């Protein structure tokens, strides 16, 4: 981060490898759900941050982790810094996980999967079975399987969230020009 700015991260020690076969893709679903209603941001985090002039937020899910971040937050605005910490708090265990919002993300993720399954991706998927010796690294695609993505329930996502989004699986990182007091 540059002078007068800080970046805020929640690193969640859960990714595709923690999923059972019938859950493949739920870590990625949760990543998407973090941008919808939370306990303190019922209109969603992006809407709140946009009103405050912050546009640089994102997340990604990997095999071993899910990382959420807000970048370029002006540290001269202590109220905004506090709000960003509250966002990390909500992401860590207070997503609302509304069924109607999950249906929106189901469609988005299925489209992401469809667009990502070009010839090179299909070839890479077959090669991964050999590269990773048929381990979970080869069989658990971060984006998820069509079977799981088409049929997961809101209760399954909520159970996965409560099983894995715990303090012993999380780290908060704040980098930049910030006074820790």
What are these regions (language model features)?
Residues 1, 179-181:
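Proteolytic maturation boundary segments
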Residues 15-20, 75-78, 98, 180:
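Short beta-strands and strand-coil junctions in structured, solvent-facing domains, enriched
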Residues 33, 37-38, 83-87, 91, ...:
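Scaffold signal of the M16-like zinc-metallopeptidase fold and its non-catalytic homologs
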